[in-house]
Structures are given as structure tokens and as C-alpha cells.
Amino acid sequence: TGVEYGDYTINFVQGCSHGCKYPCYAFSLKKRFGQVKKYEDWLKPYLVSNTLELLDKEIPRFKDKIESVQLCFTTDPFMYGYPEVERMAIDSIKKLNAAGIKCTTLTKGILPQELAQCSSDNEYGITLISLDEDYREMMEPGAAPYAERLAALKGLHDQGCKTWVSVEPYPTPNLIQQDLMELLESIGFVDKIIFGRT
């Protein structure tokens, strides 16, 4: 992948229901390569139904090269309000872990507490760019409320899981006036924080 989150990735959903108002690189990429035409189409996600079968084929081919797998780079593995996406994410993680492969997740959804039963090498993250719900409703209307994301992350942390937060794209002051220290204090329990900007 060439990014810090993981050397391999799995994208088992096409599209994303979060409806983020800031530029979405995943949508831009899919549009550029003709896989989706309009943002409205992107907002209607669908599952790659043969994901587990594909993993059965791909894991033996790449197992010796893989250090970790990121779920997901072009969508959300725990898309808010989509239990079938959550189930596929958990099943994929379990299959990868059974092959000795570490997984890293990043979501604007709610991390299921069932993840605490998976490999202790896994890392579970949320995107958190503010604590202001009005701002979330404006900029990430289909994503989980911030408090729910934080509570799920804290729940996994309290069960001994490795946790992290991506604070990106961090909104500039012309978009919202907020106290960065308050945001950082709310995530002080995590193992790692990554910053980005709009």
C-alpha cells in the first residue's frame, strides 16, 4: 500500500454511506478509474460477496510477504448501520488472524466489542476530527456519532486491545473553532494518534 497503516489492504465493500462533505480520495480514485460515476452512487455501498473465498485463495499466495492487512483503504469496515459489512469485516479479520496475519482497522463507525476476542496483535482505530456533533452531522452525516465511536474504542482498549485514532482531515479554523486539547484529552488512552489536515 505504501502507507503507514499496513502493507496490504482488503476492500470488501464498494462505496461508502458516510456522505462526508470534505473531499474523499477513495471516491475520486474510483471515479477516475470508471468504477463509479456519481457521488450519489458511491453513497450506496454493496458488499463483495465472495470476499472470504478470495481470501482463501490470496492468503496462501501472499502469506510470506504480508506483515499486516488494513481494513479498508477505500471504504469503511464497520460502516454505521450496515451489519452485513460489520460481519464480513469480523469474519475477514478472523480468517487473516488464523493465518498469523495482523490486521489494522480504521472506521467512522462503531468498533464491535467482539474484536477483543481476535488476535492481540491487531490494532483498532477510529477517525475523530472533532467532538462537536453539529459539525459531524454537517461534515460526516452518515457516520457514527463521535461519542459512540469513542465509547467503542475505549471499550476495546479496556479489554487490552491496541487502539489508535486518526485525526484527519483535521478541520482548519475557518471551518470550525474548536479546542484541540479537549479533543486530545478525550483520546489520551490510545496507543497512537495520527494527524492530517483538510
Which functions belong to the PLM regions below?
Residues 1-68:
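N-terminal [4Fe-4S]-dependent radical SAM core
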Residues 51-198:
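Conserved AdoMet/S-adenosylmethionine-binding subsite of the radical SAM
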